[in-house]
């Protein structure tokens, strides 16, 4: 489901564009599973589910996942020289814990088209030259599954899951039980990435060479991961998801496109690009006190 409202106006040397949008989606999931034993006749053609006498590991799982987004954006330019854009995005994810479901993610961009300045003299070398810069935040749900917000209770038989169950009674019979399968973290929140971009676009030599240079620096915080350390295995429950750690990605990308003609009937183009990327784990997160 999506709704969008836009407004555009040009007055003199000014250009204004406004947009508001809402999107919503829902995903429903249901899973039923069971194993049947105790068939009087073990011929394959007779081993229907209804002919069994002992149900093993019945499971019934149902959940809904909802996502809603609200976006507002405004763009302004003056005389094909100065360009500004600002936006705000508010996202809702039902799979996150109560009080952590919403995330706010702003962004801004600016550009300066130098060749549109009155003082810039037209020439055969530089046809267009533009500087760009932007900053923004985005959120993602990482490895959070659709059913994370659902409290999970499972019935397991040790014959199928050896790590579950207890031996009790005179004959040490292993009894089935109901247990909480996964720990839930009520403080789990959005994984966020904050990125800065600076770029240069140029069209040179009578529009034959297109050149673009981009530098970016991206910091991702509150990484969503399983709590692998400081979680005793004796608890008897799977470790929860947590926000922990920070990653930095920094890089430079250069792309070029050369277009020309040979005579009147033959045209050709050659493109190339080169990029560098440095990835660093700037914060490893919680450390194991035992090393």
Model segments located where?
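Extracellular/periplasmic, surface-exposed regions of secreted and cell-surface proteins
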Residues: 1-291
């Amino acid at each position: 489901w999506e709704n969008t409202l836009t407004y555009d106006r040009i007055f003199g040397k000014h250009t204004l564009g406004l947009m508001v949008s809402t999107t919503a989606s829902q995903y429903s999931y249901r899973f039923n599973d069971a194993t049947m034993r105790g068939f009087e006749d073990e011929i394959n053609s007779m081993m229907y589910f209804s002919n069994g006498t002992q149900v093993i590991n019945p499971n019934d799982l149902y959940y809904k996942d909802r996502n809603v987004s609200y976006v507002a954006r405004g763009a302004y330019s003056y005389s094909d020289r100065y360009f500004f854009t600002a936006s705000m995005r508010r996202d809702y994810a039902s799979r996150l814990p109560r009080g952590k479901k919403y995330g706010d993610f702003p962004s801004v961009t600016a550009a300066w088209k130098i060749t549109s300045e009155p003082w810039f003299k037209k020439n055969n070398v530089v046809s267009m030259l533009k500087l760009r810069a932007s900053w923004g935040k985005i959120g993602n749900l990482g490895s959070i599954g659709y059913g994370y917000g659902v409290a999970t209770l499972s019935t397991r038989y040790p014959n199928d899951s050896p790590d579950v169950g207890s031996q009790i009674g005179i004959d040490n019979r292993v009894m089935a039980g109901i247990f909480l399968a996964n720990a839930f973290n009520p403080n789990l929140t959005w994984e966020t990435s904050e990125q800065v971009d600076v770029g240069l676009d140029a069209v040179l030599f009578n529009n034959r060479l297109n050149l673009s240079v981009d530098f970016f620096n991206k910091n991702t915080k509150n990484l969503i991961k399983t709590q692998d350390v400081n979680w005793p295995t004796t608890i008897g429950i799977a470790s929860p998801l947590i926000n922990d750690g920070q990653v930095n990605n920094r890089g430079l990308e250069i792309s070029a496109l050369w277009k020309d003609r040979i005579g009147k009937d033959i045209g050709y183009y050659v493109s190339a690009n080169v990029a560098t990327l440095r990835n660093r784990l700037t914060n490893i997160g919680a450390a194991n006190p035992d090393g």
